[in-house]
Amino acid sequence: RPTCVRVRIVSDREHFGVVSDIDDTVMVSMLPRLVTAAKHAFLDRVSSREAVPGMANLLTTLTTSSASSEGVPAGTHSPIMYLSTGAWNVVPTVRSFLERSGYPAGGFLMTDFGPSNTGWFRSGPEHKRRELRRLARMFPHVRWLLVGDDGQHDPEIYAEFAREFPQCVAGIAIRSLSEIEQFMAHGSFEAMVPDALWTVPESIPVWYGSDGEALLENIRGRGTAGPLTGR
């Protein structure tokens, strides 16, 4: 039967967008990543999810404050892509969570859960690398602000992409996990030091903060909350 879907066309006149991780960036998971993937694949309880404080406001501000100057059609906002190692079958659940929590509507770049042709488990980092490169090829005129967390591989993946495609990166914003979140992700209360961020080209700004409010304050401290230039 016919199905209605939203379509967001990115025009050649648009030059700014946002890519955001989901787990521990916009949504508190408090679980090791493999367990998180399994949970998201089989449980469908939106009410059990908790939003990271301030992240909805951060992403909304980033995608709306630049819209008028970036060729964005009236009545919408700058494009945003939610990039996750979660399975495609959880998109309806995640979309409901994002809508309920006040996040801007966007597209999803998910993966398949389970064995692949090369192994029992699919590589989450490789999935993210592949999708970022695909965005660079599809929208070479767009500079993306990359939003993630320091719980796993986001700093390394984003830094690598920034070195490979500096012309496609407007900035990198990383949420630092709490001690208990670090323990659930790594088995240690010691904060992870994202050394990879020091390898980001100096022309690309990098921000670090404990939640969306801290990140937005740091970004505004640079004099802008939209398209970002200079460090």
Question: PLM features: what roles do these ranges have?
Answer:
Residues 1-125:
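Alpha-helical substrate-recognition element adjacent to the catalytic core
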Residues 86-231:
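C-terminal cap/substrate-recognition subdomain and adjoining C-terminal extension
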